[in-house]
Amino acid sequence: MARDLFSRYIWLIDTIRRYGSLTRDEINRLWMKSPYSNGEPLPRRTFYTYRNAIEELFKINIECNPSTFEYYIEQS
């Protein structure tokens, strides 16, 4: 279970880095094609939980641009 969760965090980080910035809908479409989704969408609450865990574990901030509603990884 923990290994699978860790893999999901890595998938989210890698996906946002690869594309630069993505809306929640775009993340969801890519998520549904991933091996972690079982064909199910990524619930909003789960996305925010993953986002917070990623910040806590990896010190990586996934920010949202309020004008475009796109998520991106804040460069430090």
Give short role names for the model-derived ranges.
Residues 1-76:
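Short, basic/aromatic recognition patches that contact phosphate-bearing ligands
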